[in-house]
Amino acid sequence: MPHQQILILFGLLPVATNISTWWNFGSMLLACSSMQVLTGFFLAVHYTANINLAFSSIMHITRDVPYGWMMQNLHAIGASMFFICIYTHIARGLYYGSYLNKKTWLSGTTLLIMLMATAFFGYVLPWGQMSFWAATVITNLLTAIPYLGTTMTTWLWGGFAINDPTLTRFFALHFILPFGIISLSSLHIMLLHEDGSSNPLGTNSDIDKIPFHPYHTYKDMLMLSLMILALLMTVAFFPDIFNDPENFSKANPLVTPQHIKPEWYFLFAYGILRSIPNKLGGALALVMSIMILLTAPFTHTSAIRSMTFRPIMQLMFWTLVATFAVITWAATKPVEPPFTTISQVASTMYFMFFITNPIMGWFENKIMKYN
């Protein structure tokens, strides 16, 4: 489609008439990204990247800085909202076959990896007890890499243990990565408008399109308003709902928490990591839990794009969603029976979705051919 940028500028971009609410999460992610950068800047102004002062500076922000408590809560809960939107966005892409826009899907998966890295670095910054130990456990996984692992870990830590240089590096990375995310988001949107958005039927949208503005802008604004309402209600009434009680204590390298775990949005990957009783195997499974998304465009074998008309794949998709929830829940529990077994079974089922997807596509093609 020629001159897409000019059409976007005047809000005249032709879009399929039948795209549903599931297509609104892209604009919601853009809003989340803007809010995170803005609140993050105001927090960075008052934050001190020093192991003796970091925890105190967070206390200072929430107690002494005007509306500092709001900035801190908006930033922390905004991150959770960001991940709710991105996981829904990915699920929609898997369900409706949006991954067949290869360049858009691959740039989006790269965005997810960058976002997860940024969120991880941000979780360490308050220098609470869980922040410190989560950083210790996750960064220590680098030592599982043959030959280079120990050197890479020492380089990342800035020494032989997590200390002041580690916090300084993590703050620098947490500050710089969002600019990379913004740049890549622009590329993601540009690539999307090169091919055009898919639709719930998985058909060619060219025959039935309407201008993006005002029709879809109003639809986007409705979902955006609901998201902001949910965010502000959580900030006002349940500000600590996603926080770990351990993180209200300053980091102490001499006391290990009973159960080390990251933020809720990493629990599915952490659950997959824990389910394998081998360091290198667990680290590989952790990486593969995200990287396997990159295989989706290349393993699609079905003649039908969307799962709207694929009942067997619908069953498998909702099994994947349930599996994701089960792994997240199991990862909050101690490493003991029956939780280890549940994690192992759920992790296997998670990967089985991506393995059986091309087989089911081939099977569906055979059924349609014989009918």
UniProtKB/Swiss-Prot annotation:
Name this polypeptide is given: Cytochrome b
Gene: MT-CYB
Cofactors: heme b
GO cellular component: mitochondrial inner membrane; respiratory chain complex III
Residues reported to bind a ubiquinone: 193
Entry's localization field: Mitochondrion inner membrane
UniProt key word Hydrolase: no
Membrane-spanning ranges: 25-45, 69-90, 105-125, 170-190, 218-238, 280-300, 312-332, 339-358
UniProt KW keywords: Electron transport, Heme, Iron, Membrane, Metal-binding, Mitochondrion, Mitochondrion inner membrane, Respiratory chain, Transmembrane, Transmembrane helix, Transport, Ubiquinone
UniProt binding sites for heme b b562: 75, 174
Assembly and interaction partners: The cytochrome bc1 complex contains 3 respiratory subunits (MT-CYB, CYC1 and UQCRFS1), 2 core proteins (UQCRC1 and UQCRC2) and probably 6 low-molecular weight proteins.
Role of this protein: Component of the ubiquinol-cytochrome c reductase complex (complex III or cytochrome b-c1 complex) that is part of the mitochondrial respiratory chain. The b-c1 complex mediates electron transfer from ubiquinol to cytochrome c. Contributes to the generation of a proton gradient across the mitochondrial membrane that is then used for ATP synthesis.
InterPro entries per UniProt: Cyt_b/b6_C (IPR005798), Cyt_b/b6_C_sf (IPR036150), Cyt_b/b6_N (IPR005797), Cytb/b6-like_sf (IPR027387), Cytochrome_b (IPR030689), Cytochrome_b_C_euk/bac (IPR048260), Cytochrome_b_N_euk/bac (IPR048259), Di-haem_cyt_TM (IPR016174)
CDD domains cross-referenced by the UniProt entry: cytochrome_b_C, Cytochrome_b_N
Membrane topology: Multi-pass membrane protein
Cofactor: how and how many bound: Binds 2 heme b groups non-covalently.
One GO BP: mitochondrial electron transport, ubiquinol to cytochrome c
Coiled coil (UniProt feature): none
Single GO term (MF): ubiquinol-cytochrome-c reductase activity
